[in-house]
Amino acid sequence: MTSQNPNQPISYPIFTVRWLAVHTLGVPTVFFLGAIAAMQFIQR
């Protein structure tokens, strides 16, 4: 209820930067891993 509650920070940019970093690295990684796994099954 108080604006100084540490459990509810108003530092949204921190979470935004973290979200961008996780998805920028995570989405392509999962995509390439899936593509490599698919190629392995296709060749066999």
Curated annotation (Swiss-Prot):
GO-annotated molecular function: electron transfer activity; heme binding; iron ion binding
Cofactor binding: number and manner: With its partner (PsbE) binds heme. PSII binds additional chlorophylls, carotenoids and specific lipids.
Keywords, comma-separated and alphabetical: Electron transport, Heme, Iron, Membrane, Metal-binding, Photosynthesis, Photosystem II, Thylakoid, Transmembrane, Transmembrane helix, Transport
Gene Ontology biological-process entries: photosynthetic electron transport chain
Signal peptide range in chain numbering: none
Superkingdom, taxonomy of origin: Bacteria
Cofactor(s) it depends on: heme b
A Gene Ontology cellular-component term: photosystem II reaction center
A Pfam family matched in the record: Cytochrom_B559
Subcellular location: Cellular thylakoid membrane
Record-annotated membrane-spanning stretches: 19-35
Major site of localization recorded for this protein: membrane
Annotated positions binding heme: H23
Membrane disposition: Single-pass membrane protein
Quaternary state and interactors: Heterodimer of an alpha subunit and a beta subunit. PSII is composed of 1 copy each of membrane proteins PsbA, PsbB, PsbC, PsbD, PsbE, PsbF, PsbH, PsbI, PsbJ, PsbK, PsbL, PsbM, PsbT, PsbX, PsbY, PsbZ, Psb30/Ycf12, peripheral proteins PsbO, CyanoQ (PsbQ), PsbU, PsbV and a large number of cofactors. It forms dimeric complexes.
Membership in a protein family: Belongs to the PsbE/PsbF family.
Function in brief: This b-type cytochrome is tightly associated with the reaction center of photosystem II (PSII). PSII is a light-driven water:plastoquinone oxidoreductase that uses light energy to abstract electrons from H(2)O, generating O(2) and a proton gradient subsequently used for ATP formation. It consists of a core antenna complex that captures photons, and an electron transfer chain that converts photonic excitation into a charge separation.
Protein name per Swiss-Prot or TrEMBL: Cytochrome b559 subunit beta
Name of the gene this protein is made from: psbF
